[in-house]
Amino acid sequence: MDWLDDVKWDAQGLVPVIAQEQGTGDVLMLAWMNREALRQTAALGRAVYFSRSRGKLWFKGEDSGHAQTVHEIRLDCDRDVLLLRVTQQGHQPGIACHTGRHSCFFSRLGDGAWQAVDAVLKDPRAIYG
Amino acid sequence: MDWLDDVKWDAQGLVPVIAQEQGTGDVLMLAWMNREALRQTAALGRAVYFSRSRGKLWFKGEDSGHAQTVHEIRLDCDRDVLLLRVTQQGHQPGIACHTGRHSCFFSRLGDGAWQAVDAVLKDPRAIYG
């Protein structure tokens, strides 16, 4: 498919992908996709990433139940970064982070240190237990 | 400085950085930082990236005038991605993209093709001329 060839995959065949929450505009996480992950994301309308640590496709929510419905897929001007507009499923408000928080970006720089400033919405042991 | 050591720099000494607009929540761009870029960003309160193509620090706005004032710096749960909350300077509405558009993510997937769906706000020749 031509549109998959338009993406500039890196040396590992990956691109970074930003997941932004529909409605709030909150940036939830950054993950990675390979060609097959992007193809499946577009086909299924749900986020499928490539797990670099596990070396395989990661159907977001397969363990946690916190899947992401994908409303829109965008590509940047250099064609090497993707932006998804998503609805985070399985909890209200949405939990994108494996720590049980809304967003993975819960640490803020202040007074020369990273400080966790966002609440844990659900105990990770209850998510993955 | 300890907080710089907390970041998990990749094999090239870099991390991806998402710039999100304060107020609108729009995702403007993704760029990269090395340790020195992050140190200067925090010290100056303006976005300083590392240009992978030029192999040196990139003081965002040095050519275009479209600098980014940084309100907040966040780190993700894996400590290998940064999120900036910024105000895009030099034009109203802000122009983050070298194509003269608000955001670098102006191409949307639809009908099996990437389609440019956001307007050019200023001719790039007028920005960089």
From Swiss-Prot, chains A, B:
InterPro entries: PRA-CH, PRib_AMP_CycHydrolase_dom, PRib_AMP_CycHydrolase_sf. Its EC number is 3.5.4.19. Its cofactor is Mg(2+); Zn(2+). The keyword DNA-binding does not apply. Mg(2+) binds at D76, D78, D80. GO terms for molecular function: magnesium ion binding; phosphoribosyl-AMP cyclohydrolase activity; zinc ion binding. Zn(2+) binds at C77, C97, C104. Pathway: Amino-acid biosynthesis; L-histidine biosynthesis; L-histidine from 5-phospho-alpha-D-ribose 1-diphosphate: step 3/9. Keywords: Amino-acid biosynthesis, Cytoplasm, Histidine biosynthesis, Hydrolase, Magnesium, Metal-binding, Zinc. Belongs to the PRA-CH family. This is Phosphoribosyl-AMP cyclohydrolase. It comes from Verminephrobacter eiseniae (strain EF01-2). The lineage of its organism: Bacteria, Pseudomonadati, Pseudomonadota, Betaproteobacteria, Burkholderiales.
